[in-house]
Amino acid sequence: MQIFTRKGSATDSEVLQALELEARSSLDTFRGGSRMGDDLALVGEGWSREVGNSEVVVFVGGVDKVVMGYLLARRGAVKSGAIATIEQVFVTKDARNFGIGDALITSSIEWAKGESLVALDGVALPGDRETKNLYKRSGLVARLITVTTDLQN
């Protein structure tokens, strides 16, 4: 069994779309998930465009050339310089605990260093222990907690 990661390409669009839909279906199980789903636009049929976007990096990963997960990070800027934020990282449920998520994070860290970014951020929902642990294993630690209240109810 060989774990791999590589940059995503237009030929990955169909599998990326399917994985994104699978990831979105689990958002409601976490506090803040439905709002995150509303705030973060679905790439959907636009994956072939997104993998060519210079402001974004998409990595795919899996086992023996079969894509089972992905990571999308978007460039941004802060006072100290250029950064990237991991907006989506997901591995299909049946392929978890093989190291695919760790490999995706490692690839994104290597990419960010190669791009001379000053930081790589990632987002995780409250209660999403798997994602939080994935980040922690890779050295990404909490630096900010966002709190909210629903003012419409």
Where do the protein language model's features map onto the residues?
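Conserved beta-strand in the GNAT
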Residues: 60, 66-75, 85, 90
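Conserved GNAT acetyl-CoA-binding A-motif
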Residues: 112-124
